[in-house]
Amino acid sequence: MSAPINLFILLAICLPHNNQTLTELSYNNINQSVYLGVGLWAWPIPCDADGDGDFDLIVSCPDKPSNGVWLFENATGNTKLNPMPVFKPARRLSSTSHYVMPSYTDTGMRVLTPGFEHPDFQRTGLTKRLPLGISARFYVPEGTQPKGPKVRHNQWRLVDYDGDGSRDMIVGIEDWSHYGWDDAWNSKGEWRNGPLHGFVFVFRNKGTTEAPLYDAPFKVLAEGAPVDTFGCPSPHFADFDNDGDLDLLCGEFLDGFTYFENIGTRRNPRYASGKRLKTATGTALAMDLQMIVPIVFDWDRDGDLDLIVGDEDGRVAWVENTGKMGADHTPVFSAPRYFQQQADTLKCGALATPFGFDWDGDGDTDIISGNTAGTIEFFENLSGPKVANPKWAAPKQIKAGGKPFRMMAGANGSIQGPAEAKWGYTTLNVADWNGDGLPDIVFNSILGKVEWLKNVGTRSKPVLESAVPLLVDWPGAPPKPAWTWWEPQPGTLATQWRTTPVVIDLNQDGLPDLVMLDTEGYLAFFERFRKNSTLHLKPPQRILGDAKGNPLRLNSKTAGASGRRKLCMVDWNGDGILDILLNGTNADLYKGLGKIDGSWRFEKVGPLATQNIEGHDVSPAVVDFDGNSIPDFLGGAEDGRFYFMKNPRP
């Protein structure tokens, strides 16, 4: 074969493939229902969007690559008779921006973003906009933390706050200027910066509803102090206790709700201190995830005010008002019930981290995936082997130790502070870690503790034990990232957060090794060996390098910006040498050059495709649905969906 032909083949394999398309993986299962979901961040707008008399859901999603205003049509009918319809798959109305909020007025629904109103929203989304005459940046933060955003959520609504007949402007502001962003723990795990703040402002209208003239804003007070939630207040003024005045209900950046009873009058509101909402059983009313966005709306048409709540991972729930008031004068709600839709494309929460593997031993490729919530989900391939476009079952949450598995940061587990308590950021590999013939799960998370779930079931029915640490034969105390406040236990592995643990027999000695980022962001080789009949890892060696042999440092940043690299190792181009697929606009190919002078070397080629699906990051994996023994690309994106691309090699 001539040199030019050789060069042509190399270019065809290694360069971005303009004719290669990333497509969302479809369920191909018309009778399947799954959680209703947009991408990352759900901002719900319940309404009769199509004028047929029943309630539909419009959901704004400002992520990438699923940015849009999405209409989920209710094909079942009256929500008084069936408050949990199975919605049709979403239809996109327009692109979107952050902080889309509805206001329900006596003349119909109005939809606002900071500084603007969007007429004809049900048909055209945010396509049209009219200025409101108030600067979107009216608020001046008072904190002095240098890191991070100063203001995030900025929520605008219309309501007649004081009952004078003209609509006022209400704005919820999330202030980060005291909190900062990351790396503020002391050695006891105490956050040294301030909290998030969630303030509620009123621009009183001194004109009319038709010709507003807004006064300077003031903060709403409760018992003489500013209403202040833990971020994202999502303020709703409504009469929950049926006494004729407007009470205030707020959400927050985490998962709960606070109620401020109006103990004044309709014309002169005065608010009691906030009280946390509870369910009828007395437990705290809480959503499954965080970054919640509640909308007050009588969904079941029974005359009381329910909540329609968006979650961070794109789901939306109905929180039913029971019609009862608690002894503490707060409305009592039922636990959240998450809506369902007809299955269209596979979705694993947000920031999906898929891994292709025959989990149930039936010969085909299933998908195991992590997400922001910290769960691990099993997507069963229902088609059997050698089916290029399989049919899929709805995901099932993996159990470990007999309980649904979920990693969460808790009060002080995230380097980015207590605002991330409900996140887990699981990322994983499936492999036979202990050599007993059964697939186990090795995972990393928001904590940076690398652990594994041992399979004690059978090849067709996996049963997982509770998580235990990987064992490393350190010569002394285990190292840790410089910003990690807690001390790892002896013999365990603590490294950078949210980065993939790659399980692979790199040195071909028959034992699965570990390749992943070390505490300083270098891609390192943790060699497996036997010690007293027990398998351990050796300390990391920085012997994965670039074409010149320089160690690959995939992330040199610190604290919250550390880690975050998603990767897999596979012979992508069929030359018999392992390559690396690393998160990028889709995935960047690092072509393996083999082992040279004691190090495995890789040359960066570039993205696999021209499409950019990168939000936070894309988590690369490979699958072989059609059974041709050629790995195809599967990327988990910010929107929680799986993007498939056929390997172009012949």
Question: Residue spans of the language-model regions?
Answer:
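Sec-dependent signal peptide recognition
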Residues: 1-10
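Beta-propeller-forming repeat regions
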Residues: 13-650
